[in-house]
């Protein structure tokens, strides 16, 4: 008997949600007098179906995440050689997704162009590759969605959509002002995510120090409550330095004018 093949078949069936046990496969093999190679071939087929389903899940997660697909931001594509510090390994190890599984939030704080959004997107993409639902949006977009939801009576739907993903990324906090009602909604989202079960991570990026966020959220008590819940268990990366942007820019100096003298005829 080829027990490993039966185990692989049962494992693949479980992952693709087919009710078919290794005992059933063994019984079928006996009834039809299947040779060992046939059982291995069946295991290969189920393994392929499992891989195909996994890829479909990943593709769907990426599609719904709003992360870039043409030029994806990945950890492999990030220049870690430009980042220095005593605890750099805390940053380089993010690809393990340990914050997601330990239910720890992430914040990337620093000036423009140091890689905050790239790192947040890279983490989100890793979540997608692990089959975890991820959603990316800018703080300005969230603010607009809140205002729209209030206008058309879709607040419950909006909050549920923000709580549902395992990983929610809000980029560029401090680029817009949330009015009193939207600040309350912001608190509601953070509060519900803080008690959400299962793998869970919320990511903020910002050019502003968190102590200055009160300038961008009108309702101070709700903001304080949201920040208290978010930073209760979070990894905060304060990144200093010059912008990465413009590294590929080439400056070419040219001069306009006639290259040959103009001959005057009278």
Show where each model-derived region lies.
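Post-Walker A helix-loop "phosphate-sensing" segment adjacent to the P-loop in P-loop NTPases
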Residues: 125-137
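N-terminal pre-Walker A segment at the start of P-loop NTPase domains
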Residues: 73-97
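Walker A/P-loop nucleotide-binding motif
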Residues: 103-119
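Interdomain "pre-motor" coupling segment immediately N-terminal to P-loop NTPase/helicase cores
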Residues: 18-70
